[in-house]
Amino acid sequence: MKKIITICAFAACLTGCDDLFEPAIENNLGLEYMYENSQYAEGILANAYTRIPCAGYSFNDVATDDAVSNDAENSWRKIASGMWTANNNPADRWTSCRSAIQYINLFLANADKVKWAKDEVVAQMFCDREKAEAYGLRAMYMYYLLEAHAGYTEDGVLMGVPILTEPEVAGSNFNVPRSTFVDCMKALKEDARLALEGLPWEYGDAAEMQRLAAKYAGADQGKVTRVFGTNFIGRMSGKVVEAFVAKADLLAASPAYSDQSGIDWKTAAASAAKVLNHIGGVDGMDPTGWTWYCNADDIENLSPTESPAEILWRGERAKSLSLEEDNFPPTLYGNGRINPTQNLVDAFPMLNGYPVSQSSEYDENLPYANRDPRLEAYILYNGGKAGNTNKEIFTAADGTTNDALNKVVGRSTRTGYYLRKLLRQDISLDPNAKADQYHYTPRIRYTEIFLAYAEAANQAYGPQNKGGNSYSAYDVMKKLRSRAGIGRDNGDAYLESIKNDQAKMAELIRNERRIELCFEGFRFWDLRRWKSNLTEAAKGMNISGTRYTPMEVDKRSFSEYMYYGPIPYSEVLKYDELKQNQGW
């Protein structure tokens, strides 16, 4: 991963978007330079890496029933109130993803001309691996484009995006129609196939290096390690490619797309299982995976070539405190930006595993007692503790500090809750004793793939049928909930009560996905692929004395056509072959 950052910096100095369409400006390096300078060639590909959508947090939860923001200018807050249009779209990926694909296509068109190494065997291995990375990246970007821009046009056809496999130049025909969703999925899977031919499952894996070495005459251990060794961990690999295939199949099998996607739940389950089987199925689930963001020992001791067991693909580890500055409550010197909703709080079950609405142990006067441990870990509620001094935070409307409900516009909570997930509590924002800590962004967590498998397998085979694998949707739910401490005293009686009910299991799986992946950018898209209710108002909790009163905080104004995102308005205006999705 260090190598990517170096290359990106190098590429930033050498390339610009204009150079892709026009001859290089005098005194700048042209594309021909890459043929004798492999680092420059890698810089072209590195430009695609810099645009990865999962490299950070969008907090699009603010446009769902899971969160609001106290920032009136937050773009997700604005579109949730009815301001989402084809030319005001914070969910847009058209420009960034297509730009990445342009760099990928430019790289693929020139990679065979590059002198990758003096040794011919090493040079061929490098060329094949770099091209495989490019194919994997292009498959990934197709997934993100489909998630954000696929939809039904006015003629009732489910369309994807234009499929681009050659670099565009000044004389190219830019007025290219969208391809069908089916054809886009075929293109994605063909790119994935080409990627898997040249990539190891993971860099440095002995068996994988031996497999790849067999393709090249004269490839000894030293040469193979040079090309496929641990130095390249963090770049596109076989397991990352397969994970994106699983994500794409889950999207395509979902209600919003399944009528015309050509992908069913069995396919989606098989794709997820292919990833999970490499870690031993449910036995490979990380017991501490639900607190990956604050497992201090794991994070502090993480080397550039390692990832915790929970993490399939991650970004760089770096010291920072920006997340905490944005989201710590005011008395901890934060801005309290992301405020979880009562809707989300209600989604966390009781410690015994039963939903709040079905549990005799739930006490409206003590609503946070005997709850799912993930509630305390992910959401800071009234009386909860936070920060490196373990300070008690009071969010009640009659509170005396700036942490109180609506106390200070733009800083205090609007729902009665503050964000806790993703934040390091051992950070200090005190101006007199500031202390940052290491963070990293998980691009893909194994928990996401477990949840994808559970959802697809339940729909394909039912809760307990394993569908040819060694584990079922029920098995995943049992393990996932148990690791968080749910139902340990009663054998998770609620799960046992629904293990033969496909509909109730589907509801539970969706709820577990909501909890486990909250604030990581999933629910905005999940609600759409499920065709769920988009207009449930965001609620909060007004606490005064011992009285807890639920309240409405923000309405959600979305129309039914907004299950699918728009094609950018400017693009539709420029190109008449580019058909807009219905309603936009």
Regions found by a protein language model. Name each.
Residues 37-43, 50, 74-151, 169-186, ...:
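Conserved, well-structured interaction surfaces
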Residues 141-150, 245-257, 448-462, 484:
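Extended, well-ordered alpha-helical segments in internal regulatory regions
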Residues 18-77, 96, 131, 150-161, ...:
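An aromatic- and glycine-enriched ligand-binding surface/loop that stacks and positions planar moieties
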Residues 97-100, 182, 187-189, 209-223, ...:
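Long, intrinsically disordered, low-complexity segments
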Residues 1-27:
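Bacterial Sec-dependent N-terminal signal peptides
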